[in-house]
């Protein structure tokens, strides 16, 4: 009799990706941060009603906040709770990580941008944030050329 393996290595289920961030920024470091959410926000995220393409991270009073992350409230949301779709949401990071981010952003001109949002262990929403600098126009053109060349290479290899 074969037993099912209950301890599978569960892949994190991606909720949203910020493709624009990977095109606009070159990331030096990436961090995983928890997200402080209300009940209606979790329900909306489970329904897939989230957009992080315009969002960014701000540091204020030693804490990190995710701004302009648009979570559309469901129609069946509670009537006694005011649903603000773009409210700033607190990111849950260690003090050491917050201090490192603050130092690099203030001194060296780095930006903190969310890269993706995913489920961890089925119930926790995590945000992958990247610490990086903006790309110049020629860097973006190089990325486009490289991507086109990779597609062309794959096409040629497939036909052989």
UniProtKB/Swiss-Prot annotation:
Endpoints of the signal sequence: none
Swiss-Prot/TrEMBL GO biological process terms: trans-translation
GO CC annotation terms, alphabetical: cytosol
InterPro entries recorded: SmpB, SsrA-bd_prot, SsrA-bd_prot_CS
Single Gene Ontology MF annotation: RNA binding
PROSITE patterns: SSRP (PS01317)
Main location: cytoplasm
Name of a matching Pfam family: SmpB
Subcellular location: Cytoplasm
Keywords: Cytoplasm, RNA-binding
Top-level taxon in the UniProt lineage: Bacteria
PANTHER family recorded: SSRA-BINDING PROTEIN (PTHR30308:SF2), TMRNA-BINDING COMPONENT OF TRANS-TRANSLATION TAGGING COMPLEX (PTHR30308)
Family according to the record: Belongs to the SmpB family.
Stated role: Required for rescue of stalled ribosomes mediated by trans-translation. Binds to transfer-messenger RNA (tmRNA), required for stable association of tmRNA with ribosomes. tmRNA and SmpB together mimic tRNA shape, replacing the anticodon stem-loop with SmpB. tmRNA is encoded by the ssrA gene; the 2 termini fold to resemble tRNA(Ala) and it encodes a 'tag peptide', a short internal open reading frame. During trans-translation Ala-aminoacylated tmRNA acts like a tRNA, entering the A-site of stalled ribosomes, displacing the stalled mRNA.
Protein's name in the database: SsrA-binding protein
Organism, as annotated: Shewanella amazonensis (strain ATCC BAA-1098 / SB2B)
The gene coding this protein: smpB
């Amino acid at each position: 009799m074969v037993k099912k393996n209950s301890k599978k290595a569960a892949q994190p289920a991606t909720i949203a990706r910020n493709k624009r961030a990977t095109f606009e920024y070159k990331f030096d470091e990436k961090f995983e941060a928890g997200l402080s959410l209300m009940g209606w926000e979790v329900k909306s995220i489970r329904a897939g009603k989230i957009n992080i393409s315009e969002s960014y991270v701000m540091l204020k009073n030693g804490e990190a906040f995710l701004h302009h992350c648009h979570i559309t409230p469901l129609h069946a949301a509670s009537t006694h709770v005011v649903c603000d779709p773009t409210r700033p949401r607190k990111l849950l990071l260690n003090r050491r990580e917050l201090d490192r981010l603050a130092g690099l952003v203030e001194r060296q001109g780095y930006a903190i941008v969310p890269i993706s949002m995913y489920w961890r262990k089925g119930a926790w929403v995590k945000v992958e944030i990247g610490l990086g600098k903006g790309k110049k126009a020629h860097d973006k053109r190089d990325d486009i050329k490289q991507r086109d060349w990779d597609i062309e290479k794959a096409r040629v290899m497939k036909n052989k």
